Amino acid sequence: MATPVQTRIIPIYNSQGEADAFLVYPYIFNRGGEYIGWVTPQRDVYSVMGHHVGSLTNDPRIVRRRADDSDKPRLACPPNPKRISPPAQVPLAPMMQELSYGMIDVLTENPELLHTLDSGEMRQDM
């Protein structure tokens, strides 16, 4: 009899220590369990539309350069995952180092970059 695969849900924190997203590798979900992006093996974070958003740090946080021209190419997205049920309680955020002036926390300063499939500025018109 096959045993079910246990998926590990990793909270992604913002700079204030709040869990604003969850990682079930390679997918990123918002607090409502909706798919908002994905991570490459090199820790680059992409939106559901395939646009580069930033990088996943060891904290874990999603950060990007303040003056990012985003010269990375748009990537094809992996197959859309099912919605998850986020945990009711998450561990406290680890101590995080301050970001340098040239870096920003995406979940705090640019959360619109990680939107769901049915919303967002970059979505194609019908």
Where are these regions (language model features)?
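Long terminal segments
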Residues: 1-10, 51, 57-126
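Compact, well-ordered interaction domains used in eukaryotic information-processing assemblies
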Residues: 26-27, 31-36, 41-55, 59
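N-terminal leader/targeting segments and the first structural element of proteins
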Residues: 1-32
